[in-house]
Amino acid sequence: MPPIPSLWIRVFFSWLLLSLPAAAAADFSHCGGCDDGDGGGGIWSTDNILQCQRVSDFLIAMAYFSIPLELLYFATCSDLFPLKWIVLQFGAFIVLCGLTHLITMFTYEPHSFHVVLALTVAKFLTALVSFATAITLLTLIPQLLRVKVRENFLRIKARELDREVGMMKRQEEASWHVRMLTHEIRKSLDRHTILYTTMVELSKTLELQNCAVWMPSESGSEMILTHQLRQMETEDSNSLSIAMDNPDVLEIKATKDAKVLAADSALGIASRGKLEAGPVAAIRMPMLKASNFKGGTPEVMETSYAILVLVLPEDGSLGWGEEELEIVEVVADQVAVALSHAAVLEESQLIREKLAAQHRDLLRAKHETTMATEARNSFQTAMYDGMRRPMHSILGLVSMMQQENMNPEQRLVMDAIVKTSSVASTLMNDVMQTSTVNREYLSLVRRAFNLHLLVKEAISVVRCLTGCKGIDFEFEVDNSLPERVVGDEKRVFHIVLHMVGTLIQRCNAGCLSLYVNTYNEKEERHNQDWMLRRANFSGSYVCVKFEIRIRESRGNLLSSSSSRRLQGPNSTSSEMGLSFNMCKKIVQMMNGNIWSVSDSKGLGETIMLALQFQLQHVTPVSGASSDLFRSAPIPNFNGLQVILVDSDDTNRAVTHKLLEKLGCLVLSVTSGIQCINSFASAESSFQLVVLDLTMRTMDGFDVALAIRKFRGNCWPPLIVALAASTDDTVRDRCQQAGINGLIQKPVTLAALGDELYRVLQNN
């Protein structure tokens, strides 16, 4: 579509040109024509001229009639609202001009008055419309000039838009290159692969001649060339270095933007080598570590930077523009992120390898510890069995000897031996338990016992110990001591022996004194050592103080320093083998206290023990002895057929004697297989089976199950088991195996008789 001003100029000139022939034709026709003879003959005759004018007027009229149609189409298709009125005026003017020419065709021949009138009216209307159009053009010309100015403005805007579109296209192309480079860079998490991929892809995108990466040295004093795209011709290209205080290095590290290096830059010359090259650009890349990503309190850390150097070819066709530098900056940021991820992965891998090595070391140490623990437990178990079995045999024999007729002095000595053996057996169980589970845990068995008898037995044992050591012994017992109290008899006896053994071990000659009396809370309130923890006893209670004092003669000094107290961590142990810490815990469990007092002259030392006991009133039932080793009547099982199963020869012989003492008919076997074979014979009529649970080849649980299974159709015999421990686990297994009774070792005559009596009564 042609511009608007040129269109109106054409219309204006066509109006001027067409109006002149119409006026001339009208004047010519008004003269009435000329004579045929005046014009001469030929082509320029009057008739030919008139015919030519008539045809011309017709063509002009047709052209004038077609122009308004074009103007009307143009006005409807274009948004020319302010110019539509002038378009209509031009259309009317052109139509009237065409009408004038059309009427003029009829004036070349003789015509009527109506033709002249019509021509006159047409000319008059044409004159009015042309005059109005001329006036309208006077107001339209400034608008046309403004349109021209706007056209120039639009042309300028179009050129600016073209430039912006080109810039957007270049930015889109740069973004595509950046995305492609980022995609290639992030394909790998290896640091060297990332740097090599960066150099290759940047070289393809920016048409580089060379690309190099400079890394800081371990000392941080210089930059070392570590990666380059093309190997230089110099022999020491792999050992090139630049000082860290180089101006270009400092300037590059000071800003995050890319920098174009000067032609004489040492960094640029070292990066391009001996080859001639074009402009050189460089940018920093942060080298982050895994420690930079750890949480917690922020720490001031100096960031380490690498330098990426890019060298263009020498031909001069390429340069470092803003777009190229922007691509380099974005790629450098992406490389920094990828390198940080690679650093995190490398450090994580190193940590993982260290943890794996530590885990292997821990597993090896755990395996060695487990093997050592198993070896220690095996050794302790073997040692415990070697010590426990003879002790159990001795206790069994002593319990049988207690039933013999003896005088009071012999009875006292025998009871002391029984009590001492029982304490030793309990101590072995405690040592085995605490060493196996690696904890200092001991249990108390509170029951009623005779305090007077305990003191007598303790005095008897202490007299024997001091006599063997060559030390004098004296004692004093308060007559106000209650006869029967509730507590752990074995633990109290053991602590007293521990105190005596500790003092005797430190003395070579002197006198040992034992004082037992009741504790008066009102009189001793000022003494902090007497501050006892109040026990939760439902009834009345009594506090008893055991005071053991050693006085050495002046010619002999104590073997240990007088300032050394039992509470110290390096205190010696007693002959019974129990440490003072364990002894103190036992005393605290019994709501008591233990402490020592040394003589200022170093000639004596006193150990005091304060305990609380619950009182038990003496009744006809409770007045009898309830001790484990008592002289009460033993039941008799005359004719009871018993089979004894025990792999230990000594214990089997002692248990055999105990059963015979109870009146049983006993058959002893050494293994569970022999026991099962004994039941296979038709003559077997055993009513009771006494078996040890800890046999070597076949334990007691399997033997009990086999007996129950073998005698399923017949009446099965009663089974009583012998075990070193009677905890809930052992009792549950005995119940599952069909065992009727359980006796804890050491087996004594009284305990064996009571359990057999209970089993026979219940079954």
Swiss-Prot record:
Name under which the protein is recorded: Ethylene receptor 2
* Protein species of origin: Oryza sativa subsp. indica
Q: What induces it?
A: By ethylene and auxin. Induced by submergence, ethylene and gibberellin.
State where the protein is found.
Endoplasmic reticulum membrane
What GO terms fall under cellular component here?
A: endoplasmic reticulum membrane
**One Pfam family, short name:** Response_reg
Q: Per the database record, which ranges form the GAF domain?
A: 190-339
Swiss-Prot/TrEMBL cofactor(s): Cu cation
Q: Which family does it belong to?
A: Belongs to the ethylene receptor family.
- Give one GO molecular function term: ethylene receptor activity
Q: Which InterPro entries match?
A: CheY-like_superfamily, ETR, GAF, GAF-like_dom_sf, HATPase_C_sf, His_kinase_dom, Sig_transdc_resp-reg_receiver
- The EC number(s) this enzyme carries: 2.7.13.3
Enzyme group, top EC level?
A: transferase
Membrane disposition: Multi-pass membrane protein
> Looking at the record's lineage, which domain of life comes first?
Eukaryota
Q: Give the record's keywords alphabetically.
A: ATP-binding, Copper, Disulfide bond, Endoplasmic reticulum, Ethylene signaling pathway, Kinase, Membrane, Metal-binding, Nucleotide-binding, Phosphoprotein, Receptor, Transferase, Transmembrane, Transmembrane helix, Two-component regulatory system
Q: Can you tell me which residues the record assigns to a coiled coil?
A: none
Q: What sequence ranges are listed for the domain Response regulatory? A: 641-760
Which regions span the lipid bilayer?
58-78, 86-106, 115-135
Q: Please list the residue ranges annotated as the Histidine kinase domain.
A: 382-615
